[in-house]
Regions:
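Periplasmic-side early beta-strands and strand-to-turn transitions of outer-membrane beta-barrels
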Residues: 1-65
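Face-selective signature of the C-terminal outer-membrane beta-barrel domain
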Residues: 35, 39-49, 67-209
Length: 209
């Protein structure tokens, strides 16, 4: 397990003027592992992050930076004399951000008098499966990858609030990939390696209303 906390207040420039630049970030991570047999491994990880940041160079501040992520991993070794390893991984992360003009500054700053906010949200799912085979002088690895990346958002333009509004889709990405790599040890001084990978990506875009 691990934890970290970082923060800083606004600093002053060479003329003693306060610069809008404070930030805070809190992170926690927990990882557990289990080995039911000498050839089997199970692990699980959870990560949590919370933060906020003030920006002197733009019209909005990051009043909410939330991220939650988890993943699991399974490894089985020495399944047969030639099927040496099977690995499976799956994970998910969720990001919830808020950028606004009023939570961390006065509305009069930078000449902005209107309450505005953007609330983007993102969810990513990933998967990975790999098998390893070994014969005398030959090693073969093959597997598949998967990723699903979903983006949503909602906004506030005239102080009407955003929390009651539904999220609108912005863009989605789906990726499937397959790979194979083989290695042949011809002699103590010669080794030949060859591989192939194929990926298919689908992208969908929507306009935020």
């Amino acid at each position: 397990t691990s934890m970290s906390h970082n923060e800083a207040g606004n600093y002053k420039d060479g003329d003693g003027n306060r610069v809008h630049s404070s930030f805070e970030r809190r992170n926690q991570m927990l990882q557990l592992g289990f080995t039911p047999t000498e050839n089997t491994l199970l692990t699980g990880t959870y990560e949590r992050s919370r933060g906020e940041a003030a920006y002197a160079d733009r019209m909005m501040d990051g009043s909410k930076f939330d991220r939650d992520a988890w993943n699991v991993r399974f490894v089985q070794r020495n399944i047969t004399p030639w099927f040496t390893e099977l690995e499976l991984r799956y994970g998910q992360s969720k990001i919830d951000h808020v950028m606004d003009t009023y939570s961390m500054r006065y509305l009069s700053m930078m000449g902005n008098q209107v309450k505005k906010a953007m609330n983007p949200k993102r969810e990513t799912n990933t998967g990975h499966l790999k098998a390893t085979f070994d014969w005398p002088d030959i090693n073969l690895q093959t597997g598949i990858d998967y990723m699903r990346d979903k983006h949503l958002s909602r906004m506030e333009m005239n102080g009407e609030g955003y929390r009651h509004k539904p999220y609108q889709p912005q863009q989605n990405f789906t990726q499937w990939g397959g790979f194979v790599e083989g290695a042949w040890t011809a002699s103590d001084s010669r080794k030949f390696i060859s591989g192939y990978r194929y990926d298919e990506v689908k992208a969908e875009y929507d306009t935020l209303i």
